Amino acid sequence: MTRYQHLATLLAERIEQGLYRHGEKLPSVRSLSQEHGVSISTVQQAYQTLETMKLITPQPRSGYFVAQRKAQPPVPPMTRPVQRPVEITQWDQVLDMLEAHSDSSIVPLSKSTPDVEAPSLKPLWRELSRVVQHNLQTVLGYDLLAGQRVLREQIARLMLDSGSVVTADDIIITSGCHNSMSLALMAVCKPGDIVAVESPCYYGSMQMLRGMGVKVIEIPTDPETGISVEALELALEQWPIKGIILVPNCNNPLGFIMPDARKRAVLSLAQRHDIVIFEDDVYGELATEYPRPRTIHSWDIDGRVLLCSSFSKSIAPGLRVGWVAPGRYHDKLMHMKYAISSFNVPSTQMAAATFVLEGHYHRHIRRMRQIYQRNLALYTCWIREYFPCEICITRPKGGFLLWIELPEQVDMVCVARQLCRMKIQVAAGSIFSASGKYRNCLRINCALPLSETYREALKQIGEAVYRAME
């Protein structure tokens, strides 16, 4: 991000937060230049960016003023999915979206990929090169089945931040959170079982269940506080549910952080009904609040919570470094790993361990939390400007994803196909439901570095939505 873009996003965030009100005069170009230690031309470029976004308006010989803006869209209401076990569909839509990822000319607003070009990742790339040059025998040999111990020790220390007390021996390294969740599900479930999920739910988890022949029951979920404990309890009383998949921290796709009281209530239900919790914490490190939120796993006393995570969202998906703390299922999951995915790549594990050990990881996370928070604020500004006023939009407490609910008559599955022909890709809401609900919703990735390309893409999405409403 250039200096003027950084300044523009900072000012946009202040406008979004109400620190600069409608009609209020903004600081002069000279005073902002002195305050932030940047050139006059940098401030002028930042103001021109905000003017293009229609956040500010210039007045001759008077300066810049905050523009009249649309009202803040409301947060989507509690979801109301079909509350009975169903077989998972939507694979064709997911496959179409995944295949489009290979087209580098497409604006990729559908992928939940972090910013992998952040300068704070440079120490990791240097360490990867060093590891390969100086540890050739280890790098080219077989890995330990549980993964490199030095990495497991660092992950155990990281997990202390979320309240989970584990040792290196409690952790199994995988090739990503998707692999962690897949192994966890296979260690517990069999074809014909029923698993409860939040609604909407990350499509990758549901497609894993589909491949295993497991049915899903979607549970109503509040976009600000998470899964309905009451609805979950009712489902547990009605159906032989084997387990529940939860993303309680910086949820994908809704962005909420489940309050601690609700996390403990869900764990209490799991204990009472003797079910397993599959906890996905892959976005937990990106929470806006500090210290980061606790995991459900941190309150687990009998090993029924299988905690899955990775560096895919906090660092980069290409590392293929994930982990699982499987509790009472440790031995079974080790066998599943040996039988199915076997060993991991030692080089990326060793580099990641050093990246954490030397403090680079925490510096990187602090920086990315700020950047993603500003990106979310700025993308929200753009969406408010270009989309119909009838929308609802989430207010994430971390991560980098936005969930937008459009008027009922908008079929985002059809709109997404049109946008793909225009070289813009979004994730239609229906792939986040086992039964194909949320066709009038979409998920947007806000991790991508701010640029005119993404602003223009959001403008074209808004125009396509308006056409769908006609």
UniProtKB/Swiss-Prot annotation:
InterPro entries the UniProt entry points to: Aminotransferase_I/II_large (IPR004839), HTH_trans_reg/aminotransferase (IPR051446), PyrdxlP-dep_Trfase (IPR015424), PyrdxlP-dep_Trfase_major (IPR015421), PyrdxlP-dep_Trfase_small (IPR015422), Tscrpt_reg_HTH_GntR (IPR000524), WH-like_DNA-bd_sf (IPR036388), WH_DNA-bd_sf (IPR036390)
Stored Pfam families: Aminotran_1_2, GntR
Keyword annotations of the record: Aminotransferase, DNA-binding, Pyridoxal phosphate, Transcription, Transcription regulation, Transferase
Modified residues (N6-(pyridoxal phosphate)lysine): 313
Gene3D superfamilies listed in its UniProt record: Aspartate Aminotransferase, domain 1, Type I PLP-dependent aspartate aminotransferase-like (Major domain), Winged helix-like DNA-binding domain superfamily/Winged helix DNA-binding domain
Domain HTH gntR-type: 1-69
Cited SMART domains: HTH_GNTR
GO process annotations (BP): alpha-amino acid metabolic process; biosynthetic process
Molecular function via GO: DNA binding; DNA-binding transcription factor activity; pyridoxal phosphate binding; transaminase activity
Domain of life: Bacteria
Protein family according to the UniProt entry: In the C-terminal section; belongs to the class-I pyridoxal-phosphate-dependent aminotransferase family.
Name of the protein described by the UniProt record: Uncharacterized HTH-type transcriptional regulator YjiR
